[in-house]
């Protein structure tokens, strides 16, 4: 009856007041963590697809989605949950993994509610969902080999700072080794995930004057 009267009087619920009372915002924060130095480069198209799916899923469950681009925040829990702006956090991307995982450890310690899309590693704090980078790269490399490619270059950072790229590189190397092809480390160039960085990495590869017939 109260809700009916409220509708008749065109009364709108103050969401801020309601969330303070219930201690729930009915909002999820989606934080896109950009690589350092990517500047104003275009968003990873894969993330745009993920964004659409997440938006639809939250709306279907009666939640709002708060989207933010992140680079330098030191306390995401204070920024969103403690500030009563969101009930939980979804992370897309992570920049430098070594720095990112330290922040995830802190979020776990303070009891934050979060989930990450990215690498799935043993002992990693929190809950993470990701791709099978090793086998995906292995199958992709086998496809290139089946096309007759033998001198395949690999663009991407394969250090501990980018575990997903490292997994892809390991799968890539396995496919080459099974085909009897020696992995040439000089055909690997570190690069971040943007078109501009890929372009720069390819120029760097060309400057090495090494023969290659495909780029992974």
Question: How should these model regions be labeled?
Answer:
Residues 23-142, 146, 205-207, 211:
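Alpha-helical recognition/docking segments in bacterial nutrient-uptake
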Residues 58-69, 153, 169, 173-197:
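Short beta-strand elements in bilobed, periplasmic/extracellular small-molecule ligand-binding domains
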Residues 117-118, 152-156:
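Short beta-strands and strand-loop turn motifs
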């Amino acid at each position: 009856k109260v809700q009916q009267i409220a509708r008749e009087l065109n009364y709108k619920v103050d969401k801020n007041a309601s969330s303070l009372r219930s201690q729930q915002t009915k909002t999820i924060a989606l934080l896109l963590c950009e690589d350092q130095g990517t500047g104003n480069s275009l968003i990873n198209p894969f993330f745009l697809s993920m964004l659409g799916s997440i938006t639809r899923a939250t709306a279907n469950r009666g939640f709002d989605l708060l989207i933010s681009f992140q680079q330098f925040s030191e306390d995401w829990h204070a920024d969103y949950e403690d500030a009563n702006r969101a009930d939980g956090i979804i992370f897309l991307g992570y920049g430098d993994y070594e720095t990112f995982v330290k922040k995830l450890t802190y979020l776990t310690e303070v009891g934050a509610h979060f989930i990450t899309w990215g690498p799935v590693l043993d002992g990693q704090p929190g809950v993470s969902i990701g791709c099978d980078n090793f086998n995906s790269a292995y199958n992709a490399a086998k496809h290139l080999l089946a096309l007759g490619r033998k001198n395949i270059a690999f663009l991407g950072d394969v250090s501990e700072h980018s575990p997903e790229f490292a997994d892809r590189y390991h799968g890539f190397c396995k496919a080459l080794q099974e085909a009897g092809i020696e992995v040439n480390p000089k055909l690997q160039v570190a690069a971040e995930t943007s078109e501009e960085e890929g372009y720069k990495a390819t120029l760097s590869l060309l400057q090495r004057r090494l023969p290659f017939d495909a780029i992974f």
